[in-house]
Amino acid sequence: MKRKHLITLICAIACVVFLLIGILCSLSIQVTHYTVTSSNIPKNFDGFRIAHITDLHNDEFGTDNDTLISLLESAKPDIIVITGDLIDSYNTNVDISVSFISRATQIAPCYYVCGNHELRMPNEYASLKKQMKAYGVTILEDRSAVIEINGESIQLTGLVDRSKLSAQQVSHLTDSTYYTILLSHRPEHFSQYMEMGADLVFSGHAHGGQIRLPIIGALFAPGEGFLPKYADGMHTNNDTTLIVSRGLGNSSFPIRFYCPPELVIVQLKAQ
């Protein structure tokens, strides 16, 4: 075999291996752990564990989401926060999402905000909300809830999904006397979340870019464009920390590449 043909063959094999690894490594859920430290976290919330679910898009991991539920159970969260797109507007199956909710609420109290896919389907979303409420899910649509442990409290605030957001629209929802955790579907509004005075923000929406390259990372994300800054990971600016999950499911574009589905577990640490 001529040297030129050999090099071509080696390059072709390398490309196939690269593609296969990228696809295969994106089939299983990756559990990512973060520790968030702040002097604003009450002492009684030191060690408080939060599981973050986002962008399930009525997908399933194992029969009836057994794999996802098992990972949640192993994490032993104190609460589960869900930041939207439980259902998918292109391939809707409310029953899958409701079945997941019925099992997740047996693990820990669940707090939910909607994503853009729910808002595209008002009838299906109304059905989903009704069933989630029946299972005890706290739905935070531009409202807040307080969690108390032995006389100390933190605040959870949730925003209805908006493609455009002004901090002035929603700043009344947060109370600076609490350590405030904000649930909002879109990470691209990080600067507005800072203006609101949120201490910790959970978001999804970007799917980690879905197509990622080693070293480079995400190539594109909705709402952020090419080479997005907030496709995944933990980002801190001033006193606000944003945690963006790559999410779990897919929507109209069915492939993830070097972008595993993600379950995020956050532990609070009082300083």
Task: For every predicted segment, state its role.
Residues 187-264:
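Conserved beta-sheet core of the metallophosphoesterase superfamily
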Residues 78-79, 111, 137-138, 154, ...:
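Short, Asp-centered acidic motifs that coordinate Mg2+ and/or phosphate
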Residues 37-51, 137-138, 145-157, 175-178, ...:
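Beta-strand-turn-beta hairpins that frame and shape the catalytic cleft
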Residues 20, 32-38, 174-183, 188-189, ...:
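Extended recognition/assembly regions associated with phosphoester-bond processing machinery
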Residues 48-138:
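Membrane-embedded segments
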Residues 122-137, 143, 149-192, 196, ...:
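Binuclear metal-dependent hydrolase catalytic cores centered on His/Asp/Glu-rich metal-binding motifs
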Residues 1-44:
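N-terminal membrane-anchoring alpha-helices
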Residues 53-58, 84-86, 116-118, 143-144, ...:
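Active-site metal-binding loops of divalent metal-dependent hydrolases
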